[in-house]
Amino acid sequence: MPSFDVVCEANMIEVKNAIEQSNKEISTRFDFKGSDARVEQKERELTAFADDEFKLGQVKDVLVSKMAKRNVDVRFLDYGKIEKIGGDKVKQVVTVKKGVSGDLAKKIVKLVKDSKIKVQASIQGDAVRVTGTKRDDLQSVIAMLRKDVTDTPLDFNNFRD
């Protein structure tokens, strides 16, 4: 029976490349001369450092533009609060989302059931498995989910026939 998984996962290699490109641009830009602006990564947690809130906004803009160039959806980023760290310096923690949250998984299952397409959706950990008898039904579910779920980037993988 054909099936596929609905997941929400960023390509961490591309995220790392975007951070390296951002740091390179920040180190060469004239408006960051002499400042301690940078972006650091620890697993799925990015930390943006800058001299003040305005420069922190500039650092985030550079990071977002580099991620967009590397085809990493910026909806994966979850911005934390801006914290002061001694003097005028500030930092902000940015978390890269992973997995389909419980609320989103329930929403996806409800959308699939309400669509009246002959498929079954089940929550399996941080993914949603959609199973049906026809491949065409699965393709119509993918099209429907891409249209209806716009607040979170969804990937479809693990296709089985």
Curated annotation (Swiss-Prot):
InterPro entries xrefs: DUF520, UPF0234-like_C, YajQ-like_sf
Keyword annotations: Nucleotide-binding
Gene Ontology MF annotations: nucleotide binding
Gene Ontology cellular-component annotations: cytosol
PANTHER family documented for this protein: UPF0234 PROTEIN YAJQ
Family: Belongs to the YajQ family.
Function: Nucleotide-binding protein.
Protein name as annotated: Nucleotide-binding protein Bphy_0527
